[in-house]
UniProtKB/Swiss-Prot annotation:
Biotechnology: Xenovulene A is a natural product exhibiting little structural resemblance with classical benzodiazepines yet is able to displace high-affinity ligand binding to the benzodiazepine site of the gamma-aminobutyrate A (GABAA) receptor and could be potentially used as an anti-depressant with reduced addictive properties.
Induction (UniProt): Expression is significantly up-regulated under xenovulene A producing condition.
Lineage, broadest ranks: Eukaryota, Fungi, Dikarya, Ascomycota, Pezizomycotina
Gene name as annotated: asL2
Name assigned to this protein: Xenovulene A biosynthesis cluster protein asL2
Disruption phenotype: Does not affect the production of xenovulene A.
Gene3D superfamilies, A to Z: Dimeric alpha+beta barrel
Chain's role: Part of the gene cluster that mediates the biosynthesis of xenovulene A, an unusual meroterpenoid that has potent inhibitory effects on the human gamma-aminobutyrate A (GABAA) benzodiazepine receptor. The first step of xenovulene A biosynthesis is the biosynthesis of 3-methylorcinaldehyde performed by the non-reducing polyketide synthase aspks1. The salicylate hydroxylase asL1 then catalyzes the oxidative dearomatization of 3-methylorcinaldehyde to yield a dearomatized hydroxycyclohexadione.
Length: 115
């Protein structure tokens, strides 16, 4: 049996900036952020995304959002496109994300759906 081909991906983790403005900036720019993401979601480039939280919410309490995480299906040659998308994203331009602390780690995805 041949080994399955592995897909090139980037695991992107971006913390929020510090400061009391961040929660409101995230809320205010959320609709624009989602609209900005739509093209990449539909093209199959952004395959997973969501907020990073301080802890899993309990008892109906709202989560404390500390940043964002996403998986991008992209080759090494597309890293420049990914960096531009991140820097132009409404969460970056509105002061939510701290791109200076971003971690963008390449990985090879062997399983995308459960077995």
């Amino acid at each position: 049996m041949a080994a399955p081909s592995l897909e090139s991906n980037w695991l992107v983790q971006i913390p929020n900036q510090s400061g009391s403005h961040v929660a409101q900036a995230r809320k205010d720019s959320f609709a624009e952020h989602m609209s900005y993401n739509k093209t990449h979601i539909e093209a199959g480039r952004m395959v997973l995304a969501g907020p990073l939280v301080e802890a899993l919410p309990q008892d109906g309490q709202p989560p404390v959002i500390t940043g964002s995480i996403m998986v991008w299906k992209a080759t090494a040659g597309e890293r420049e496109m990914l960096d531009k998308w991140l820097s132009d994203n409404p969460f970056a331009t509105s002061g939510v994300w701290d791109l200076t602390k971003m971690e963008c780690t390449p990985f090879l995805c062997g399983v995308r759906k459960g077995l």
